[in-house]
Amino acid sequence: MAFPTTSAQQAETNRKILEEIQTKKQLLAGGIINLGLSPPNQMPAPQLLGQPTTVNPDFQAGVGIATNATSTTRSAFNPTSSTTLGFFIPQDSYFGNSFIPVLPRLEPLPSPATTPTAPPSHSISK
C-alpha cells in the first residue's frame, strides 16, 4: 500500500505540475520547443521577392554539402555527384534533403519521318 499523502503534499505536487504545463505552453506559444530532437527546429522567416538571398555559412563554397552533414549524407553525395550528368544545388533543409538534383535539358530525339533513311543493305540470297 502507498503512504497516504497530506493535502499540503498534494497541493505542492499539483502546483509543480501546473508550473510545468504553463512553461510548456509558453514554449509552444513562442515557437521554441525541442520535441526530442537534438537542435531546436526553428523555421527561417520567409524571404520576400527582390531581396538578396543569403547563404548558410554551414555550406562549403564549391563543395555543395554542409560541413555539419552526417557521414551518410556525404557518402551519398560524393558518388552521386561524380556519376551523373546533372549537378546538385545544396540547400539548408529541415527535412533531411541536403541537396536538390538538377538534370540538364536534353534535346528530343528526331522523329523517324525526319531522319534520312540509309540505303537498303545488300543481302546475298541463295
UniProtKB/Swiss-Prot annotation:
Signal peptide: none annotated. Transmembrane segments: none annotated. Residues 107-119 have a biased composition (Pro residues). InterPro entries: SOSSC. GO terms for cellular component: nucleoplasm; SOSS complex. GO terms for biological process: DNA repair. Disulfide bonds: none annotated. Residues 106-126 are annotated as: Disordered. Belongs to the SOSS-C family. This is SOSS complex subunit C homolog. It comes from Drosophila sechellia.
